[in-house]
């Protein structure tokens, strides 16, 4: 029973890797950016757990900035993906401009929250 489960998991990872290798480079770069943003948020949470969160507004601002940026990057990835039929008429330049504008608004709110 355990061997078949292990074999199924290996087959699953192999199929995911082969499917992801066909992903365009621009989507892989966006994926890397999302992973970096989430990893940065996790580092901030671990730091807060170990050291403390004295300036709590700063901690919240940093984590919300990372998570908000990751969410906006996922939205960009959805819009730029050529296989997505919902955003077929949307130009990649327009999607990137929306991403930049939303990031600007997000970070203005974050800076305002810092006080």
Curated annotation (Swiss-Prot):
Q: How does it sit in the membrane?
A: Multi-pass membrane protein
- Which residue spans belong to the Cytoplasmic compartment? 1-31, 77-94
Specify the protein name.
Answer: Dolichyl-diphosphooligosaccharide--protein glycosyltransferase subunit DAD1
| Subcellular location, principal | endoplasmic reticulum
State the gene name recorded for this protein.
DAD1
Instruction: Name the family.
Output: Belongs to the DAD/OST2 family.
Q: How does it assemble?
A: Component of the oligosaccharyltransferase (OST) complex.
Taxonomy of origin reads: Eukaryota, Viridiplantae, Streptophyta, Embryophyta, Tracheophyta
Give a yes or no for keyword Transmembrane in this entry.
yes
- Write out the annotated subcellular location: Endoplasmic reticulum membrane
What does the entry state regarding organ or tissue expression? Ubiquitous.
**Entry GO CC:** endoplasmic reticulum; membrane; nucleus; oligosaccharyltransferase complex
A GO BP entry? protein glycosylation
Positions on the Lumenal side per record topology:
53-55
Statement: the UniProt record of this protein carries the keyword Metal-binding? no
Role: Subunit of the oligosaccharyl transferase (OST) complex that catalyzes the initial transfer of a defined glycan (Glc(3)Man(9)GlcNAc(2) in eukaryotes) from the lipid carrier dolichol-pyrophosphate to an asparagine residue within an Asn-X-Ser/Thr consensus motif in nascent polypeptide chains, the first step in protein N-glycosylation. N-glycosylation occurs cotranslationally and the complex associates with the Sec61 complex at the channel-forming translocon complex that mediates protein translocation across the endoplasmic reticulum (ER). All subunits are required for a maximal enzyme activity.
Pathway it acts in? Protein modification; protein glycosylation
Segments spanning the bilayer are 32-52, 56-76, 95-115
User: Which keywords describe this protein according to UniProt?
Assistant: Apoptosis, Endoplasmic reticulum, Membrane, Transmembrane, Transmembrane helix
């Amino acid at each position: 029973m355990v061997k078949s489960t292990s074999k199924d998991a290996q087959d699953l990872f192999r199929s995911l890797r082969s499917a992801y290798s066909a992903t365009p480079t621009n989507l892989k770069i966006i994926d890397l950016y999302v992973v970096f943003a989430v990893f940065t948020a996790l580092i901030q949470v671990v730091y807060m757990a170990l050291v403390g969160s004295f300036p709590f507004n700063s901690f919240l601002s940093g984590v919300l900035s990372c998570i908000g940026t990751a969410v906006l990057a996922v939205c960009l990835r959805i819009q730029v993906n050529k296989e997505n039929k919902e955003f077929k008429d949307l130009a990649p330049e327009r999607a990137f401009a929306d991403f930049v504008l939303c990031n600007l608004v997000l970070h203005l709110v974050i800076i305002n929250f810092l006080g």
